[in-house]
């Protein structure tokens, strides 16, 4: 296969396992992309092929760019260096560097399709550019993944993305749900984590969904070893130039994957001029313990009191608040929150998905005129954020609705949480009033069936390497008591989840009595728990086994460790990457001898090299 050569200063060496005539090399020399003349490409990481001979292609109403492609032109290589700030996420200050090049292909009819490639220091990305007065029919991108290759993929659930990420070594159909009516399938949602070579990983996802874009998914129905990109909408009309979202491949070690900001690097910059009103934080949350609790003013007041007592800035009043009684209505609840110095948030049904028999309020946000009236009412009553639920799919019209909700909320200073929603694709940068997104099989599922009970520990040690890589995750961590189905993870494990899982808005799910019964030292940590991080480091771990993540807030490092095994384990790690000062002290909240309880100790940071965890256990260490 003939390849086009370009000389780049940083690539004046041969990457073992890749063509010497590599087309595009990242500024640090780690990522190499080689594009062939017939519309295929290969990605290498640290000299190792991680994606070999992937296919490019699109079909439109007027043109077929899936076969017979020939490279007509390879443009000049340019350099990208960017810095930007976030309000939340893995780190506040982000920077990225990439080499960029655009390739023009012609099909057998002579029509042109452009593909813009970027080789970043932590991955590769590409997008299609089509032109004319035409209609997109399908994307023909194919990612080959050979049998025997480890992969962690979540079966596609377009109305929620609430599935597990089980380890698999082949492309056979998977069943990602306990419900009998959910059949095994060969369609998968983003992100997908793959280990093509031992110790070398890639995470496949997408970024920069704009108006008129559907989301996409992966499908290997036709070929178990080739995953095709399917669009969430059947056809898309366009005039002039049309750019696809960025097909995104984060690559490297597990630390490279977890610490990457490539999804937001590729997204549009923030559209908000003033973000001073956006304040991430912790919220009390009534729904987990009382599914219909928002109908009861007295219960709602208990959760507002909890937020005030724990010094959490927010309290979320969930579904059915429009039916509130027992001494008053929602306006009484909002007034009570203001009296207590707690910022209230309210839940809404998006009303384009689950409608019949679904919780209320409904149809208050669909039409723009109604939406603006509702937003004004919220502002007038001191509501600072809303949670919007039950989105149906990844169609372009649904994606546009998300953007409508986000954009219209800005003048009213409303932050948004999306629940029952699509996975993050970079909007947290473009619209920083987006606090968090569910799109995860989270603690709420203890309400629905016992499926999570025996799988939570493995799941919790997988999603830091998969779902949470691409954006904030509203798992609602920290269930010390039981809901309708039990949990068998330890108290140390549950405490660690609050740091292991990144979310600008962290909803605390348990009952007020559960927090009251925690040791004083643990309660104190929860009162000052950050949700904004200056930096993030993966210290150790492997999907489904264990994970140790460090996050920095100011001068303090918070280290969360999770044991995903059904047996005790010593989690070993090094603090060398944290740059600690001599004499730094650690407050360690580790497992007790049983599921419930803690072993609390203080020690020198220099002595913190491993922590013993019981089965399905965990720990939180705070270095100040």
Give the residues covered by each predicted segment.
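C-terminal beta-strand-rich structural cap/linker in extracellular carbohydrate-active enzymes
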Residues: 601-624
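N-terminal accessory beta-strand-rich subdomains and adjacent acidic, glycine-rich linkers
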Residues: 20-263, 595-597
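Carbohydrate-binding surface patches
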Residues: 542-580, 619-622
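Aromatic- and carboxylate-enriched substrate-binding clefts and catalytic-loop regions
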Residues: 318-490
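C-terminal motif of bacterial Sec signal peptides marking the signal peptidase cleavage site
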Residues: 16-17
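Edge strands and adjacent loops of beta-rich recognition modules
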Residues: 90-95, 526-549
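Catalytic cores of secreted or luminal carbohydrate-active enzymes
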Residues: 492-538
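An acidic-aromatic substrate-binding cleft motif
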Residues: 239-314
């Amino acid at each position: 296969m003939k390849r086009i050569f370009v000389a780049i200063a940083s690539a004046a060496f041969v990457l073992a396992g890749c063509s010497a005539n590599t087309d595009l090399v990242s500024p640090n020399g780690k990522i190499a992309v080689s594009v062939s003349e017939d519309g295929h490409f290969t990605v290498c990481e640290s000299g190792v092929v991680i994606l070999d001979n992937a296919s490019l292609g699109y079909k439109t109403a007027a043109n077929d760019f899936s076969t017979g492609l020939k490279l007509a032109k390879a443009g000049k290589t340019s350099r990208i260096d960017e810095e930007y700030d976030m309000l939340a996420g893995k780190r506040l200050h982000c920077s990225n560097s990439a080499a960029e090049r655009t390739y023009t292909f012609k099909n057998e009819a002579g029509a042109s399709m452009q593909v813009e490639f970027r080789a970043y220091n932590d991955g590769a990305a590409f997008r299609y550019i089509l032109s004319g007065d035409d209609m997109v029919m399908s994307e023909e991108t194919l990612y080959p993944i050979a049998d025997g290759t480890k992969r962690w993929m979540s079966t596609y659930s377009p109305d929620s993305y609430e599935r597990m990420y089980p380890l698999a070594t082949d492309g056979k159909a998977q069943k990602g749900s306990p419900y009998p009516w959910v059949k095994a399938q060969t369609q998968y949602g983003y992100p997908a984590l793959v280990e093509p070579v031992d110790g070398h990983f890639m995470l496949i996802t997408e970024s920069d969904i704009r108006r008129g874009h559907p989301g996409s998914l992966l499908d290997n129905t036709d070929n178990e070893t080739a995953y095709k990109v399917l669009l969430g909408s059947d056809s898309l009309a366009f005039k002039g130039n049309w750019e696809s979202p960025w097909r995104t491949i984060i690559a490297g070690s597990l630390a490279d994957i977890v610490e990457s900001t490539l999804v937001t690097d590729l997204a549009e910059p923030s559209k908000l001029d003033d973000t001073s009103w956006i304040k991430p934080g912790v919220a009390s949350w009534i729904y987990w313990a009382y599914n219909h609790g928002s109908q009861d003013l007295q219960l709602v007041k208990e959760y507002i009191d909890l937020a005030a007592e724990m010094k959490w800035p927010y309290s979320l009043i969930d579904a059915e608040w429009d039916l509130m009684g027992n001494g008053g209505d929602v306006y009484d609840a909002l007034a009570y929150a203001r009296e207590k110095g707690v910022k209230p948030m309210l839940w809404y049904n998006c009303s384009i998905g689950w409608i019949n028999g679904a919780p209320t309020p409904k149809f208050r946000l669909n039409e723009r005129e109604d939406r603006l009236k509702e937003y004004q009412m919220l502002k007038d009553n001191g509501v600072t954020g809303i949670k919007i639920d039950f989105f149906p799919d990844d169609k372009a019209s649904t994606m546009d609705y998300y953007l409508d909700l986000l954009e219209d909320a800005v003048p009213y200073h409303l932050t948004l949480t999306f629940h029952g929603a699509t996975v993050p694709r970079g909007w947290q940068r473009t619209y920083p009033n987006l606090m968090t997104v569910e799109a995860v099989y989270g603690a709420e599922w203890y309400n629905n069936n016992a499926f999570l009970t025996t799988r939570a520990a493995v799941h919790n040690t997988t999603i830091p390497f998969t779902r949470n890589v691409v954006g904030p995750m509203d798992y609602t961590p920290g269930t010390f008591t039981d809901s309708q189905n039990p949990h068998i993870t330890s108290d140390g494990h549950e405490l660690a989840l609050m740091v292991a899982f990144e979310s600008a808005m962290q909803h605390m799910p348990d009952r007020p009595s559960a927090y009251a019964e925690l040791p004083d030292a643990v309660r104190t940590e929860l009162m000052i728990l950050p949700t904004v991080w200056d930096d993030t480091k993966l210290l150790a771990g492997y999907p489904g086994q264990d994970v140790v993540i460090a996050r920095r807030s100011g001068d303090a490092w918070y280290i969360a460790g999770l044991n995903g095994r059904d047996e005790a384990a010593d989690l070993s790690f090094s603090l060398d990457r944290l740059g600690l000062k001599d004499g730094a002290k650690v407050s360690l909240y580790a497992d007790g001898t049983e599921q419930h309880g803690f072993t609390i100790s203080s020690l020198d940071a220099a002595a913190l090299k491993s922590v013993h965890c019981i089965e399905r256990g965990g720990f939180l260490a705070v270095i100040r």
